[in-house]
């Protein structure tokens, strides 16, 4: 079977790497891919953009692709899965109408409210003055979110009213994030510990994947601006068996049932970004209609089951008949980024040391990279995700940073404390 992975990030490198391990697979194509997928055994890049829906359909038809897995959110929101379905091509991901769950934060919040699924109190605004009046009413700290897709950067955690008002002015008055910021969600600032809960859904049945925890803030100690994610680990100790059951019962099951009841049956990866309160109550911060990045990298390091078989089972509506098996060892991934990220940064720097990382120590998933001759060059903000397994989170962290320290390019940086919460739990 031939497989097509859509996207160009570290998540897509991990998906291609895992799909190529399936005994059912003869060839994996990645459109457009990156420097890492270009050199992955059994994997080939295809020069088609992730949002070129007609081009992807034509390629999949021509190559008789047996399964397409969509990595990023933008093609889903543009209707890629709908186009593949019309062409009779198997594609794992939600249709455009269901992908509104990620494509519009206002849609997601209203959906949660309709179905009684726990989330933060909120207001939705398209006009500046009512938004500012609401801010003055609720006070700070508060969270300001662009309604549409903003590459993980459209969320402002405001500790004071001035920061919140500036964010609202930027979005509704200044055009920051363009159409994505033409409507804003202002919501209650929740406290607790974050966790990422990702499942596969076939329309009715839910197959939960292992838990994970992302690190959104750019700097150590969870400081600095929000990013697409600076590292992740799996499993997340905060998600105990009891909390896992609560998440399934209070969040995932009513979400899937609610979508079906509204005529939006959901098929694909469904990611709930959660805040776990001190009493164990899970509240939804956001939904993503795809795997998280960088959570995918440690998750797929741990997944022992055949990813392709799981996707095919979902397309057949039989996720209730399969299981996902996991390596008991934790995995941890550290994102190496370009200096200046998530703001302005340079590309085109040569990366050295990739060959110095032994495969027994870590796996380097490439994201913002490209090939030029024999060299790998930086080509984005988040450049690599260096991922390792360990007997515990502390060992996985040690091995990941040992590998990170072998890799260099001009102005590379990373957080040095990925996994700190889990390690504190291990030591307590």
UniProtKB/Swiss-Prot annotation:
Which parts of the sequence bind Mg(2+)? 286, 288
Please list the cofactors this protein needs. Answer: Mg(2+); Mn(2+)
Q: Highest taxon of the source?
A: Bacteria
Q: Which Pfam families match?
A: GARS_A (PF01071), GARS_C (PF02843), GARS_N (PF02844)
The cross-references to Gene3D superfamilies, in alphabetical order and at most eight, read: 3.40.50.20, ATP-grasp fold, A domain (3.30.1490.20), ATP-grasp fold, B domain (3.30.470.20), Phosphoribosylglycinamide synthetase, C-terminal domain (3.90.600.10)
Q: Which reaction does it catalyse?
A: 5-phospho-beta-D-ribosylamine + glycine + ATP = N(1)-(5-phospho-beta-D-ribosyl)glycinamide + ADP + phosphate + H(+)
Q: Which SUPFAM superfamilies match?
A: Glutathione synthetase ATP-binding domain-like, PreATP-grasp domain, Rudiment single hybrid motif
Q: Which GO terms describe its molecular function?
A: ATP binding; metal ion binding; phosphoribosylamine-glycine ligase activity
- Give start and end of each ATP-grasp domain: 109-316
In this chain, ATP is annotated as bound at: 135-196
Q: What is its EC number?
A: 6.3.4.13
Keyword Nucleus applies: no
According to the record, the residues making up region (Disordered) are 211-235
Q: How is the cofactor bound?
A: Binds 1 Mg(2+) or Mn(2+) ion per subunit.
Q: Tell me the disulfide pairings in this chain.
A: none
Query: Which SMART domains would you find in this protein's record?
Result: GARS_A, GARS_C
**Keywords noted in UniProt:** ATP-binding, Ligase, Magnesium, Manganese, Metal-binding, Nucleotide-binding, Purine biosynthesis
Record field: transmembrane? none
Concerning InterPro entries, the annotation shows: ATP-grasp, ATP_grasp_subdomain_1, PreATP-grasp_dom_sf, PRibGlycinamid_synth_ATP-grasp, PRibGlycinamide_synth, PRibGlycinamide_synth_C-dom, PRibGlycinamide_synth_C_sf, PRibGlycinamide_synth_CS
Its annotated pathway reads: Purine metabolism; IMP biosynthesis via de novo pathway; N(1)-(5-phospho-D-ribosyl)glycinamide from 5-phospho-alpha-D-ribose 1-diphosphate: step 2/2
To which protein family does this belong? Belongs to the GARS family.
Q: What is this protein identified as? A: Phosphoribosylamine--glycine ligase
Q: What's the gene?
A: purD
């Amino acid at each position: 079977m031939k497989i097509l992975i859509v996207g160009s990030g570290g998540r897509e490198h991990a998906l291609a790497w895992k799909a190529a391990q399936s005994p059912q697979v003869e060839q994996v194509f990645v459109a457009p891919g990156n420097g890492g997928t270009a050199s992955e055994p059994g994997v080939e890049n295809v020069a088609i953009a992730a949002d070129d829906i007609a081009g992807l359909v034509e390629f999949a038809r021509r190559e008789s692709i047996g399964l397409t897995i969509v990595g990023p959110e933008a093609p889903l929101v543009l209707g890629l899965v709908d186009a593949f379905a019309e062409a009779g091509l198997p594609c794992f991901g939600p249709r455009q109408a269901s992908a509104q769950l990620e494509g519009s934060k206002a849609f997601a919040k209203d959906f949660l409210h309709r179905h009684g699924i726990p989330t933060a109190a909120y207001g939705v605004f398209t006009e500046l003055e009512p938004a500012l009046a609401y801010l003055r009413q609720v006070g700070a700290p508060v969270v300001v979110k662009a309604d549409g897709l903003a590459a993980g950067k459209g969320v402002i955690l405001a500790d004071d009213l001035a920061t919140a008002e500036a964010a609202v002015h930027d979005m509704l008055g200044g055009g920051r994030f363009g159409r994505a910021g033409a409507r804003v969600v202002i919501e209650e600032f929740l406290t607790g510990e974050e966790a990422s809960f990702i499942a596969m859904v076939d329309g009715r049945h839910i197959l939960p994947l292992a838990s994970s925890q992302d690190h959104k803030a750019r700097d150590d100690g969870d400081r600095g601006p929000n990013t697409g994610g600076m590292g992740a680990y799996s499993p997340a100790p905060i998600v105990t068996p009891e909390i896992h059951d609560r998440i399934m019962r209070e969040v995932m099951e009513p979400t899937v049932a609610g979508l079906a009841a509204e005529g939006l049956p959901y098929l694909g990866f469904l990611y709930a970004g959660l805040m776990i309160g001190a009493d164990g109550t899970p509240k939804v911060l956001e939904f993503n209609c795809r795997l998280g990045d960088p959570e995918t990298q440690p998750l797929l390091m741990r997944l022992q089951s055949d990813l392709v078989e799981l996707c095919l089972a979902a397309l057949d509506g039989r996720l209730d008949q399969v299981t996902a098996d996991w390596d008991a060892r934790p995995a941890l991934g550290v994102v190496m980024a370009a200096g200046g990220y998530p703001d302005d940064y340079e590309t085109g720097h040569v990366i050295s040391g990739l060959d110095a990382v032994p495969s027994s120590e870590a796996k380097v998933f490439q994201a913002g990279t490209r090939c030029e001759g024999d060299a790998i060059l930086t080509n984005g903000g988040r450049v690599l995700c260096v991922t390792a397994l360990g007997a515990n989170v502390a060992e996985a962290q040690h091995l990941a940073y040992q590998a990170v320290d072998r890799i260099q390019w001009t102005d590379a940086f990373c957080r040095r404390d990925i996994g700190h919460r889990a390690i504190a739990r291990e030591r307590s």
